[in-house]
């Protein structure tokens, strides 16, 4: 992260104020203040992660994935032979915290802050699928988008989507 000396001074002062306002996280803010004041390049890269960016297209794709899982679950609930498909297969798992943290953070934001998809079960790991899911979800979306009635899926269509 490139910053001018003036920007570093402003951010350093912000961390100093946060130390006073939030004593429970004071040590963390003091550490960040030191990194900013001294310009430690390697550690300043941590700020890049904190101030990351998720493009609009990516956000829309994540919402589309969540909407697909909503449609899968609604369709599964309406099936007469729902027992043939395990409910866990139509339950949104989330994203891998280790490799897809930005996506996971957006899912948590959508559910916990925006109040969308609150009916999704976060499980004990808070939507951490613990395995990379992005590519799997992309394949599933391709199949889902090709279905003529995306919210009234047949058993066969549900199986095609979850097995993509």
Curated annotation (Swiss-Prot):
Q: Which SUPFAM superfamilies match?
A: YfbU-like
Q: Which InterPro entries match?
A: UPF0304_YfbU (IPR005587), YfbU_alpha-helical_sf (IPR023146), YfbU_helix-hairpin_sf (IPR023145)
UniProt family annotation: Belongs to the UPF0304 family.
Q: Which NCBIfam families would you find in this protein's record?
A: PRK05445.1
HAMAP family of this UniProt entry? UPF0304
**Protein's recorded name:** UPF0304 protein CKO_00501
Name its species. Answer: Citrobacter koseri (strain ATCC BAA-895 / CDC 4225-83 / SGSC4696)
């Amino acid at each position: 992260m490139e910053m001018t000396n003036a920007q570093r001074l402003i951010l350093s002062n912000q961390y100093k104020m946060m130390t006073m306002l939030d004593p429970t996280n004071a040590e963390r803010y003091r550490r960040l203040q030191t990194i900013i004041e001294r310009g430690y390049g390697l550690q300043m890269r941590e700020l890049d992660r904190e101030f990351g960016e998720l493009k609009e297209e990516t956000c829309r794709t994540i919402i589309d994935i969540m909407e697909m899982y909503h449609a899968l679950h609604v369709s599964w609930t309406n099936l007469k032979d729902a027992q043939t498909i395990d409910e866990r297969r139509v339950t949104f798992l989330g994203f891998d915290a280790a490799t897809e943290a930005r996506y996971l953070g957006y899912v948590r934001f959508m559910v916990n802050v925006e109040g969308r998809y609150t009916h999704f079960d976060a499980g004990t790991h808070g939507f951490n699928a613990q395995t990379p899911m992005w590519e799997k979800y992309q394949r599933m979306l391709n199949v889902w988008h090709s279905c003529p009635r995306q919210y009234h899926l047949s058993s066969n269509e549900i199986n095609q989507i979850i097995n993509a």
